[in-house]
């Protein structure tokens, strides 16, 4: 029975194991991470809701060794197979740090670099390579170094190529937080990219930058209002290309829009990490400059033991590294520090004994200095065709100024804490509170400047859109009124006008979609304004297109081209809609299934316009007889098109319903869009729907259960058969069966013989014979 029970338990355990997904991160909303700040309980990322949680045991604080960090990852994530750890590339801001033994947690944030807890087999990070940037990698199988070492290698490699380090990731793990290589992306310097932007301003869409407050502030806290990183919006930049139609007598150019995807810009202003962009003539010069720098703790407040080269002493000395920022005179061990700086600096010191030192002062690896009027300079400059380039430069100047000011405050904070070590506890607390208020003040000031910058840019973009649309409409009307009108020229002007209206509508919808995601309350306030504007665009296009049929000869000749143009516009609108309402898939595994496009219900109906839109010389034309066309009864449309579904094709054939739409026939606009905002996951601000398992995982689990069920049933049947057979088997003890027909005397004699009795008569005759 025991072997059968063992098989039964083994089969049940196997079936249970088959239900567990093989992907270690499957079904997780966030990546497993831990963060430490000495004097506070450790924090770890809740992989189910994307929030930072305090240490579950209420006792663990900062850990000094990488082995201890790995063990702690395994403790806080027991259900995951944590195999390694690695430092994150960027610091984060975390609030609600708790002290040991206290129930109340502080709400003010701290800047720290978390550790990523790697699940399962190591997989290198997927790096995005922006335009004009290069992807590079380095591997050395004889080297096994830390994250910091490979970060330095990547940064120096980009500096040698006169570029900036954009992003990087580790390759080939060889120990705990140790690797044999690095992959990284180098991008052109700011000055070069500015020149490229200025030269290509006519080919790129103007973007609206929405600033970048750290979203990690908003982990459900109601004590601090945080500016959410906002997306860029596309503005209008048109491109003329030659019309290769041989029938166009005057050779007018046709405007073709260079459509580019809608970009996201979520720049974190709390990241004070600096980038070295110094180009050097030799490796020795680079090392000499690095080793001459003073030790910098950086803006973060961790206490990591590191080494730096002290030029005055001529040897390496220990210091505490905060975890982010700082400079490259920062080494893990004294041996590594001396290996890099010892020989080069000794040669440099020998040279200085023979000749005076004429080298320039050491340059701190911070970003380029910025003027204090970064925003004022942009605001004083009038808008022009290079609005995008001017806005980008103003944005970069503003961020550089903010980083410099934050770095200065952090250095002052560090110095104040060093001097306040011997002060009473109340004075220390006052110092900390003073600098916290100063940091918050700088953040608020930067947010206000960003908002002012964005509002100005938005106003200029809208003015540019209005001017181009007005000019396109005037050219279209002029072409229709020409004597005689030229059909090809009319079509070209109509095409430009439709593109201008399309850009206006696209700009409006994307702006509203952005506001809807980051601030539903504000979106509800501006909803009527947005829909009224869409209504005006719709009416204006209807009346402008109906004017085409005032000239029947022209309308009939270019009818096919007009239909194709409007169909293309409809397809483009559908694509924009799909991109707008499809929610992003956020998962570190294959369990997160987002709702399909058909499951996301967003209906928009048209608002009534107070008063009819009027334009000189524009009157709808009804001579083609619209009575034969069914009335438009549908009002629900996709939000990108902002027109009734039956009219979205915008066919302009006579009697299509385009020329006889009246204001009073259009019902009141309603917006049935669900304004979703999930504060639990602040990166995308949309409600995410996750299923327990995807289809592939369900199939695997079902197959495993079936196999396990068959094995269990087989074991049970075999066990029962064996038990039954054993129960009915005859038991023999060596007794000879006696025939029931014999007499009692013979039966008694047989029993006596079995017990050893021998007949004396038989024994006598046997002895006689012998």
UniProtKB/Swiss-Prot annotation:
Location of the motif OX-2: 344-365
UniProt site (Required for Cu(2+) reduction): 170
SUPFAM superfamilies: A heparin-binding domain, Amyloid beta a4 protein copper binding domain (domain 2), BPTI-like, CAPPD, an extracellular domain of amyloid beta A4 protein
Binding sites annotated in the UniProt record for Cu(2+) 1: 147, 151, 168
Stretches for region Disordered: 194-284
Positions bearing Sulfotyrosine: 217, 262, 336
Pfam family, one: APP_Cu_bd
Site entry (Reactive bond), positions: 301-302
Residues modified as Phosphoserine: 198, 206, 441, 730
Residues reported to bind Zn(2+) 2: 677, 681, 684-685
Phosphothreonine carried by residues: 729, 743
GO function term, MF aspect, one: receptor ligand activity
Compositionally biased spans, kind Low complexity: 268-281
Motif (Basolateral sorting signal): 724-734
Residues the record marks as site: Susceptible to oxidation: 706
Function, as annotated: Functions as a cell surface receptor and performs physiological functions on the surface of neurons relevant to neurite growth, neuronal adhesion and axonogenesis. Interaction between APP molecules on neighboring cells promotes synaptogenesis. Involved in cell mobility and transcription regulation through protein-protein interactions. Can promote transcription activation through binding to APBB1-KAT5 and inhibit Notch signaling through interaction with Numb. Couples to apoptosis-inducing pathways such as those mediated by G(o) and JIP. Inhibits G(o)-alpha ATPase activity.
Domain text: The transmembrane helix undergoes a conformation change and unravels partially when bound to PSEN1, facilitating cleavage by PSEN1.
Protein's recorded name: Amyloid-beta precursor protein
Organism of this sequence: Macaca fascicularis
């Amino acid at each position: 029975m025991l072997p059968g029970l063992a098989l039964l338990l083994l089969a049940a355990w196997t079936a249970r194991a088959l239900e567990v997904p093989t992907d270690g991160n499957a079904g997780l909303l966030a990546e497993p991470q831990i963060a430490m700040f000495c004097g506070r309980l450790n924090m770890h990322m809740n992989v189910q809701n994307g929030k930072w949680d305090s240490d579950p045991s209420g006792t663990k604080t900062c850990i000094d060794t990488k082995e201890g960090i790995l063990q702690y990852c395994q403790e806080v994530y027991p259900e995951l197979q944590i195999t390694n750890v690695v430092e994150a590339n960027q610091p984060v801001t975390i609030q609600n740090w708790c002290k040991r033994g206290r129930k109340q947690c502080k709400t003010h944030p701290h800047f720290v670099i978390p550790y990523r807890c790697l699940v399962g087999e190591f997989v290198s990070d997927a790096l995005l390579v922006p335009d004009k940037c290069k992807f590079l990698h380095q591997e050395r199988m004889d080297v096994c170094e830390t994250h910091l070492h490979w970060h330095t290698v990547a940064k120096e490699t980009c500096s040698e190529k006169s570029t900036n380090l954009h992003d990087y990731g580790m390759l080939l793990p060889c120990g705990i937080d140790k690797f044999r290589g690095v992959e990284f992306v180098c991008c052109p310097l700011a000055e070069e990219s500015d020149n490229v932007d200025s030269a290509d301003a006519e080919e790129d869409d103007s973007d609206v930058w929405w600033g970048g407050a750290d979203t990690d502030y908003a982990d459900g806290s109601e004590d601090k209002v945080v500016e959410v990183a906002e997306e860029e919006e596309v503005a209008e930049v048109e491109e003329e290309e030659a019309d290769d139609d041989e029938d166009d007598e005057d050779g007018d150019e046709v405007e073709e829009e260079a459509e580019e995807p809608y970009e996201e810009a979520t720049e974190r202003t709390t990241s004070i990490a600096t980038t070295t962009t110094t180009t050097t003539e030799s490796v020795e010069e680079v090392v000499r400059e690095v080793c001459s720098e003073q030790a910098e703790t950086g803006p973060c407040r961790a206490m990591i033991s590191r080494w730096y080269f002290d030029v005055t002493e001529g040897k390496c000395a220990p210091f505490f590294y905060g975890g982010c920022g700082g400079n490259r005179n920062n080494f893990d061990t004294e041996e590594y520090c001396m290996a890099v700086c010892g020989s080069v600096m000794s040669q440099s010191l020998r040279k200085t004994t023979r000749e005076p030192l004429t080298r320039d002062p050491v340059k701190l690896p911070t970003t380029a200095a910025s003027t204090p009027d970064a925003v004022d300079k942009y605001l004083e400059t009038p808008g022009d065709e290079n609005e995008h380039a001017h806005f980008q430069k103003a944005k970069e100047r503003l961020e550089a100024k903010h980083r410099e000011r934050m770095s200065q405050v952090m250095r002052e904070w560090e110095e104040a804490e060093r001097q306040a070590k011997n002060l009473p506890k109340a004075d220390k607390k006052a110092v900390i509170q003073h600098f916290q208020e100063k940091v918050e003040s700088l953040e608020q000031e930067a947010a206000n400047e960003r908002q002012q910058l964005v509002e100005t840019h938005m106003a200029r973009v809208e003015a540019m859109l209005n001017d181009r649309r007005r000019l396109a409409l005037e050219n279209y009307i002029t072409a229709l009124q020409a004597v005689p009108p030229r059909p090809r020229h009319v079509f070209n002007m109509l095409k430009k006008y439709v593109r201008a209206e399309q850009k206006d509508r696209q700009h409006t919808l994307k702006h509203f979609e952005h506001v809807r995601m980051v601030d539903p309350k504000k979106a509800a306030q501006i909803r009527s304004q947005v829909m009224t504007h869409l209504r005006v665009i719709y009416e204006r296009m209807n009346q402008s297109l109906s004017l085409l049929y005032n000239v029947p000869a022209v309308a009939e000749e270019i009818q096919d081209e007009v239909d194709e143009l409007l169909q293309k516009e409809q397809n483009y609108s559908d694509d924009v809609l799909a991109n707008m309402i499809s929610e992003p898939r956020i998962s570190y595994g294959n369990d997160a299934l987002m709702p399909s496009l058909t499951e996301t219900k967003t209906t928009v109906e048209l608002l009534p316009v107070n008063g009819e839109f009027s334009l000189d010389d524009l009157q709808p034309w009804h001579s083609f007889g619209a009575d034969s066309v069914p009335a438009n009864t549908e009002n629900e449309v996709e939000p990108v098109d902002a027109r009734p579904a039956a009219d979205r094709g915008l066919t302009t054939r006579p009697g299509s319903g385009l020329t006889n739409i009246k204001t009073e026939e259009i019902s009141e606009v309603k917006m049935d869009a669900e304004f979703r905002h999930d504060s639990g996951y602040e990166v995308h601000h949309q409600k995410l729907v996750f299923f327990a398992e995807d289809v592939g995982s369900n199939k695997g689990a079902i197959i495993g259960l079936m196999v396990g069920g068959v094995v269990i049933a087989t074991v049970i049947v075999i066990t029962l058969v064996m038990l039954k057979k054993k129960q009915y088997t005859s038991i023999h003890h060596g007794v000879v069966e006696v025939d029931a027909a014999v007499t009692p005397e013979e039966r008694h004699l047989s029993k006596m013989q079995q017990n050893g009795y021998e007949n004396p008569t038989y024994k006598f005759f046997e002895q006689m014979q012998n």
